[in-house]
Amino acid sequence: MLERRQGSGTYVLSLGGGSAIADYFAAANNRDLIELRQTLEVTAAGLAAQRRDEDDIEQLRALLVRRNELWAPRHVEPHNVEEAISTDIAVHRAVVAASHNALYLELYDSLLGLMDHYMRGNPIGAECSFEHEHTRLVESVIAGDIGGATSATERLFTELGLSRDQPGRNFPHHPHD
């Protein structure tokens, strides 16, 4: 479930599944998730740079500012972890939403629970914030720079060290086991 906050953006409140595709994705491993995200987000970023509107721009700016604030401390305070994760996911989702491709957004939304789980298994804080990469991505989309948006997204995944050769790690929830 998402909540839209005026002047602040859209936040992920709950990560309900309920669809067959969500069950299938729940059995995926991290490598599979990252490969799908990278493919989807790079293309969506280019489309977002072409198609974003004023509402998208306003939301992207607000989410980026809040995301970078939350991720700035060396170690995110425990009471801010939920918001730090949901705001990071919301930035990426807002880029996909700005592509104005309903199927991309539907597919992306089906991945939200996995993304949340993945992020909880990794460090959160300034040393792993990738603020520059997130900022470059959002600024490129806002500027309408298609090449900049796609390369910023590729760079973000490269900086995260999430190459296609990274060994997969299964998520603990397997609904069909």
Residue ranges, per PLM feature:
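Short linear motifs at protein or domain termini
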Residues: M1-G46, Q50, R169-D177
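Short helix-coil transition/hinge motifs at the ends and kinks of transmembrane helices
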Residues: S19-Y24, P73-N80
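Residue-level detector of well-ordered alpha-helical segments, enriched
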Residues: L36, L40, D56-Q59, E83, ...
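Amphipathic alpha-helical segments enriched in hydrophobic/aromatic residues interleaved with Lys/Arg
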Residues: D56-R74
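C-terminal all-alpha effector/ligand-binding and dimerization domain
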Residues: V65-N68, E83-T87, D109-D177
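Short basic (Lys/Arg) and small-residue
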Residues: V95
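Short loop-to-helix capping motifs
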Residues: S99-A102, G144-D145
